[in-house]
Amino acid sequence: MIEFVYPHTHLVAGVDEVGRGPLVGAVVTAAVILDPARPIVGLNDSKKLSEKRRLSLYDEIKEKALSWSLGRAEAHEIDELNILHATMLAMQRAVAGLHIAPEYVLIDGNRCPALPVPSMAVVKGDSRVAEISAASILAKVTRDAEMAALDIVFPQYGFAQHKGYPTAFHLEKLAQYGATAHHRRSFAPVKRALGLVS
């Protein structure tokens, strides 16, 4: 992996999203400005960490970061805008929520939302940029907790296990029970369950 070279600036925010692929719930984003004086050991792409390690780092990031913020776009916004535009909106909300304005924003992936400060997309940024790794951890822990809470209300769907992704089990239960108010109606498997497409 090519080592990432940081822009010449001090207050760098990292941004990442979780939940573009699921059929249910919000897409959740986070923005994080780390404190160079309080390094956090072990930051990595949230998907490469155990749940226990993510939870430990989640608390440490919130305690040590200069600023952090969560953003989101709800299922109905995803349906209205489409998943790409809703993700960009959620990223804008995360950056806007930082109580310290960043001088530069690094975003995981290959495109940036419109922001009032300079920004750059970083492919595989969640593995290459500590700020993006931290954002990916905050976003994933937050969204996983939301899926666990939804699982209590709708235990038949198994949200705590698959986090809303279109697993065979989820698709089976969607066909059996229909869609909840939290499902994304613009996504093809949900449309099929609702009888909106053949």
Swiss-Prot record:
The record's catalysed reaction(s) read: Endonucleolytic cleavage to 5'-phosphomonoester
Q: Per the database record, which ranges form the RNase H type-2 domain?
A: 10-198
Q: Could you confirm whether the keyword Nucleotide-binding appears in this record?
A: no
**Under the GO molecular function aspect, what terms does this record hold?**
manganese ion binding; RNA binding; RNA-DNA hybrid ribonuclease activity
Tell me the residue numbers annotated for binding a divalent metal cation.
Answer: 16-17, 108
Q: Which UniProt keywords apply?
A: Cytoplasm, Endonuclease, Hydrolase, Manganese, Metal-binding, Nuclease
Pfam family example for this protein?
Answer: RNase_HII
Provide the family line. Belongs to the RNase HII family.
Q: What is this protein called?
A: Ribonuclease HII
Organism encoding this protein: Salmonella paratyphi B (strain ATCC BAA-1250 / SPB7)
Instruction: State the encoding gene.
Output: rnhB
